[in-house]
Regions:
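Enzyme catalytic cores with a strong preference for nitrogen-chemistry domains
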Residues: 1-324, 340
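ATP/NTP-dependent adenylation/nucleotidyl-transfer catalytic domains that generate, transfer
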Residues: 195, 221, 245-326, 331-577
Length: 577
């Protein structure tokens, strides 16, 4: 009987930080070795960070990554390590290095290269053509990368039919809401269908607009979960795999005897690479695998936003942020996220009232700042607003007050926030949500200014849900109740309400999900029971405001289809359908 201990290290690399990433990887290898692991796996492109985008077009970047791999190989004595890197042949490959006892024994090249959503693998990499399995004593295991395991056939099936008892998949799988459950079910199915133990290791951390959730998983040969890593945290998880159980399961599962696969048609060749002929059992205490708990949807999204904000700010060299508080839900939620991400002392909030700012907004903004313990300033902009109106009065003569005058206030606020940013080196966090940016209910060069739009991909109804979550988890509510219950308003004119300009958010968010995330047609949305005039207004307004969204700060992806990396539409476009 052979029992093999597998460790999965979900690390948080920094893009292009070869020294730092290499040190992280070596620390994980050393820790796994000290806990008696036979194999430790690290995520896809762990050496470079993911996704490197056009850094992959720089030969010197590829060379630096290979140099880092050499250092990792030398540090991997007494263990087998699987590490994601960029391999160079006549082309470049998204690759996994299989290192055994300080020697690079083999390399796997990713076969399925995704070219949808946020993925551009085909832009850079050449697909692999082999599906190697690795012999470790009497244990055979296969290695593949991320997308390779999302298909029922492909490398996983080829490797299993060639004798692999264990499949190790290294991934950089970006987060979106509810993806974790879908991914877990898929992986359990792969393990059960192929009668293999399956280990999946994922990146954790933020990279620009993407967040990686970790959530590494290990399943037994029946598809039962035996270990799960923490979500949105670095972690190192272990499991002991008994390959005799895999053999017994296969004896009792006649499906494998009937399976056939045309390897040539798949473009893959199965080959065996020997790591060691003999396995020497290690003396070690039995290990108990940890199964981290699943989170509620609200907690999951909130933690994704916290991690994405923390990493975006810190990895880009900032320590502090500044936020304009309006007394509304959006800026309140962003302030809570920022305080959790960076610490209250690193978050500066500013309230900038005019004649249209209500007493309730002033009260609630101050209460929120006090509850969070963040530095808080009030900078009145009424006099500046008056000066703008006076300066423009000759040019505006004969016209009525309207959107132009309203937006002057937002742009004054934007200027003040940017001045504070320049003076104190703090990153401005913009506070717009997905519903408003979808239909352009925001001011270009005003409330849109900033270095990161934290809730850019969060629909308005989800904003409210997250605010309730923030208050539920606290001994005392952090967000004043009136901020949540009052009708939303930009407060740029007398008695202004969002619903004066927009459909109710319950309707708007539903139509936006159908149009933006599902690409449903106008006719299909009307057939769902939505008012034709409202549907046509939403579609037209979304399309017309593409130019605004192109100029917005990046934001953290949490839905299945975010603006920017996911949804790529032309600005100049007259098609409505």
């Amino acid at each position: 009987m052979t029992t093999i201990r597998i460790a999965l290290a979900q690390i948080n690399p920094k893009m292009g930080d070869f020294a730092g990433n290499t040190a992280q990887i070596i620390r994980a290898i050393e820790q796994a070795r000290s806990h008696g692991a036979d194999i430790v796996a690290l995520p896809e492109l762990a050496i470079t960070g993911y996704p490197p985008e056009d850094l992959l077009l720089k030969p010197q970047f590829i060379a630096a990554n290979l140099k880092a791999l050499d250092e990792i190989v030398a540090a991997s004595t007494g263990i087998t390590a699987i590490v994601g890197f960029v391999d160079k042949t006549t082309d470049i490959h998204n690759a996994a290095a299989v290192i055994h006892d300080g020697v690079l024994k083999g390399v796997y090249h990713k076969t399925y290269l995704p070219n949808y959503g946020v993925f551009d693998d085909y832009r850079y990499f050449k697909a692999g053509e082999t599906a190697p399995i690795f012999q470790w004593g009497d244990v055979l295991f296969g290695v593949n990368i991320c997308e390779d395991i999302w298909y029922p056939g492909g490398p996983t099936q080829v490797q299993a039919l060639a004798g692999a008892q264990i499949i190790i998949n290294i991934s950089a799988s970006p987060y979106h809401s509810a993806k974790g459950g879908d991914r877990e079910r898929m992986l359990a199915t792969r393990a059960e269908d192929n009668a293999v133990a399956l280990a999946y290791v994922n990146l954790v951390g933020g990279q620009d607009e993407l967040v990686f959730d970790g959530d590494s998983l290990i399943f037994d040969e029946r598809g039962r979960l035996i270990a799960r890593g923490k979500v949105f945290e670095e972690d190192l998880i272990y499991a002991d795999i008994n390959t005799e159980k895999v053999f017994r399961e296969r004896l009792h599962d006649p499906r494998r005897r009937q399976e056939r696969i045309d390897v040539a048609s798949e473009g893959m060749r199965a080959e065996t690479i020997v790591l060691t002929e003999k396995y020497e059992a290690k003396a070690r205490a039995k290990i108990t695998s940890a199964i981290a708990p699943r989170l509620s949807e609200a907690e999951e999204v909130y933690k994704a936003l916290v991690l994405g904000t923390r990493d975006y700010v810190r990895k880009n060299g900032f320590e502090r942020v500044v936020i304009g508080l309006s007394g509304g839900v959006d800026s309140a939620l962003v302030a809570c996220i920022a305080a959790d991400a960076l610490g209250a002392d690193k978050v500066r909030c500013v309230f900038m009232p005019t004649r249209y700012s209500s007493n309730e907004s002033a009260r609630d903004a101050a209460s929120l700042a006090r509850n969070l313990g963040v530095p808080y300033d009030v900078i009145a902009i009424e006099d500046t607003f008056k000066q703008y109106l006076e300066m423009l009065s000759p040019v505006f003569a004969g016209t009525t007050m309207g959107v132009a005058e309203e937006n002057i206030q937002a742009r004054i606020r934007g200027n003040i926030l940017m001045a504070l940013s320049n003076k104190f080196g703090a990153l401005v966090l913009s506070t717009g949500n997905k519903s408003e940016s979808s239909v352009g209910y925001c001011t270009l060069y005003g409330d849109m200014c900033g270095g990161l739009t934290v809730i850019k991909d969060v629909p308005k109804l989800l904003v409210y849900e997250l605010c309730h979550y923030v208050n539920r988890r606290s001994a005392q509510p952090l967000i004043p109740e009136y901020i949540i219950t009052r009708p939303p308003s930009a407060e740029l004119r007398e008695d202004q309400k969002d619903q004066d300009s927009l459909p109710p958010y319950e309707i708007l968010d539903a139509i936006l999900e159908m149009y933006v995330e599902q690409d449903m047609s106008i006719d299909a949305m009307i057939a769902e029971g939505y008012d034709e005039q409202t549907v046509r207004w939403v579609v037209r307004t979304v399309d017309l405001n593409e130019y605004k969204r192109r100029q917005a700060a990046p934001g953290i992806k949490v839905t299945t289809r975010a603006f920017g990396r996911d949804r790529r539409m032309p600005i100049t476009n007259v098609y409505r359908g």
